[in-house]
């Protein structure tokens, strides 16, 4: 399956860095340079996704990606800038990655502190 060029949207992948403070709380930052990628981004829908994510479904995006910059087991919880600029905090987080022979299905969850 090939993704149509006209359906692809430019987004930016930001790899996360996790450190801990004195009280062992996680501090997530995105210090690395953003990586430009093109993917098909759509609103998440469907019965299966509704059963998995429930009321969070309205904050989810379903994406299709072809390439090697996002990989299953490596990029979960990294940030994606969909509606914000590449120099801002990511507005979405990678929730899951499913690898198929010709593409990857990626579920994004909107960060709580963002709108859209």
PLM feature segments, named:
Residues 27-116:
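Short, conserved turn/kink motifs that form compact alpha/beta structural patches or helix kinks used as
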């Amino acid at each position: 399956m090939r993704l149509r060029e006209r359906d692809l949207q430019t987004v930016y992948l930001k790899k996360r860095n996790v450190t801990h403070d004195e009280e062992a709380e996680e501090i997530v930052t995105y210090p690395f340079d953003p990586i430009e990628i093109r993917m098909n981004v759509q609103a998440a829908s469907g019965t299966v996704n509704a059963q998995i994510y429930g009321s969070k479904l309205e904050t989810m995006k379903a994406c299709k990606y072809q390439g090697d910059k996002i990989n299953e087991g490596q990029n979960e919880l990294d940030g994606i800038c969909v509606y914000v600029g590449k120099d801002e905090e990511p507005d979405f987080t990678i929730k899951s990655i499913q690898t198929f022979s010709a593409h990857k299905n990626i579920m994004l969850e909107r960060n709580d502190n963002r709108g859209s």
